[in-house]
Regions:
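Surface-exposed binding patches on compact interaction domains or structured appendages
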Residues: 53-84
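Short, solvent-exposed loop/turn segments enriched in Ser/Thr/Gly
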Residues: 38-45, 94-102
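Beta-sheet-dominated interaction scaffolds and their linkers
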Residues: 13-51, 122-124
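Buried hydrophobic-core signal for structured, non-transmembrane domains
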Residues: 44-50, 87, 101-106, 118
Length: 124
């Protein structure tokens, strides 16, 4: 009688675990603070982890302006492993004032597209 109850618990446990690749970022909002347009380019190392149960591939990272550039590898990231997206933000190409840009990370995860926000205050 106890054995069927134990099996019910196992099936419930399996239902809670993710199926497929799932991506988890070190942060989804990157605060750069106050930057002058004459400041050097800002290099940001954004890490992510595959918290799913199959390999994950970052397919594309879309930027919303010419002041940001990204570099990443389209390698398979195995479950439990980490990957990196390098973001370069050039303050000289950003407009003066509040800076708010969204990067779209397209991957093979069950989430599909994730958004990463860059924030700064740009001064002359």
């Amino acid at each position: 009688m106890l054995f069927p109850l134990m099996l019910c618990g196992i099936s419930e446990l399996r239902a809670e675990q993710p199926e497929g690749a799932s991506i988890e970022f070190s942060t989804k909002v990157i605060e750069l603070g106050e930057l002058s347009q004459s400041d050097d380019k800002q290099i940001i190392r954004l890490t992510y982890k595959n918290i799913g149960d199959v390999p994950l591939v970052v397919l594309e990272v879309r930027t919303s302006c010419s002041c940001t550039d990204v570099q990443f590898k389209r390698d398979r990231v195995l479950p439990g492993e980490r990957g990196v997206i390098n973001i370069t933000m050039d303050p000289s190409k950003a407009p003066v004032g509040s800076f708010f840009r969204v990067l779209q990370v397209v991957s093979t995860s069950t989430e599909g597209v994730e958004r990463i926000t860059l924030k700064a205050e740009i001064i002359e």
